[in-house]
Amino acid sequence: MSQLPLELGLSFNGGDILFQLLAMLILLALLKKYALGPLLNIMKQREDHIAGEITSAEEKNKEAQQLIEEQRVLLKEARQESQTLIENAKKLGEKQKEEIIQAARAESERLKEAARTEIVKEKEQAVSALREQVASLSVMIASKVIEKELDEQAQEKLIQDYLKEVGESR
């Protein structure tokens, strides 16, 4: 087995291998210091930035959810308040309607009572005027009867004539 590289025409030089190994280690150290370090720093910064963006997005999402919930609560309160206002307006309208109806009824009763009073007053005046006319007619009839001594038929005719006169004078 140790003869295999010699048979193929390959020879191993320990110094070359050591030199190449040393050069490789130096190259890796330089890459780590100048390329891998900054690259890892950039990747770390990118990772931190993405994590920060995710955290910020989650916080904004939570804030948005809170705002949505607050808006729902405010909307619910506004609906309840508007419903209360509508109910109060309906109650006030009903109350005013009842007050107007009561006022109209009271006014109607007042007008009826005033009309009744006026009717009674006019009736009393008419009765009084009628009594005066009857009294004056009675006096006139009595004076006519006294002036003339009339039989029953003549008296009836005289009364009818006076009643016609009274009817025409009205």
From Swiss-Prot:
It holds the Pfam family ATP-synt_B. It is found in: Cell membrane. The chain crosses the membrane at residues 15-37. GO terms for cellular component: plasma membrane; proton-transporting ATP synthase complex. It is a single-pass membrane protein. F-type ATPases have 2 components, F(1) - the catalytic core - and F(0) - the membrane proton channel. F(1) has five subunits: alpha(3), beta(3), gamma(1), delta(1), epsilon(1). F(0) has three main subunits: a(1), b(2) and c(10-14). The alpha and beta chains form an alternating ring which encloses part of the gamma chain. F(1) is attached to F(0) by a central stalk formed by the gamma and epsilon chains, while a peripheral stalk is formed by the delta and b chains. The F(1)F(0) complex interacts with SpoIIIJ and YqjG; YqgA is found in the same complex. NCBIfam families: ATP_synt_b. HAMAP family: ATP_synth_b_bprime. Belongs to the ATPase B chain family. This is ATP synthase subunit b. The gene is atpF.
